[in-house]
Amino acid sequence: RIPEVFERFAGDPRIQHSSQPLVQEQLSGRDVAVIGVAASAFDNAATAAEAGAKVTLVGRAKTLPRLNKMKHTVTAGFAEGFPLLSDSEKLAWLRHITACRIAPPRHTVQRVAKLGIELVLGAEINEVTEQGEALLLNAGAEKIRSDLVILGTGFTMDPAAMPALADLASSVTSWQERLPESAWQTGDDEWQRFPYLGKGFEFLAKDPQRQRALGRVRCFNHAAQLSLGNLANDIPHASFGAERLARALAADFFVEDNAHHYQALMDYNELELLGDEWPTAF
């Protein structure tokens, strides 16, 4: 997700997303601004500071969130049961968790706090201008010079923006298309754009005639959260997600090649008993 104020700098090497790797040997002595206060923002801030950069961590919130309700979902029941909930129940769970904001891990905050990083809270970047080879971030009373800006601003949901999915995006069923307008609340725009997935992470086609082809594409990433929970975007649940994906693929491969497997069954002739076990029985 690229905040609007940074959009005109798309492709500029002075701005990158927190999901991109940092070239640590190029950070020493540089001014780095990290936007956001989620875990990835803190991790990037710490890595940059440890590489010798002067780091400013900027957040819109006036205080850091202290609670991570997502930790309450780290159970086998949630991992296996969330996909079985009704659509409205799934939406209610994730609405509440995100509305409460998710605190970065305690050890991550402790790591950042020890590195002399400047924390600027209650500040929203409303203008970005160039200052020589650097950028000047205007956040009201705060003016932050930066050689590199790292956006820890999360991800947006837009399959059409991905080259690999661009030709398929218009055929993919979204959550907006599965729920009536009355089910949605203000602020649900992002949830509406999530793809509505099948039980094995497969895309579901708007047109049933395209399902066989579209169902071959598995969406094993953050976009699966609303349909299947945290099976593809949360470390504690990753093993559950991998198993679900593997089982779904194995089942689909078998069904697709049923004729081959059935013929193999008909041809199977490996004897279990060779005749010497109890000769009078044969």
Which role does the model predict for each range below?
Residues R1-A39, D43-F282:
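Flavin (primarily FAD) cofactor-binding/catalytic cores of flavoenzymes
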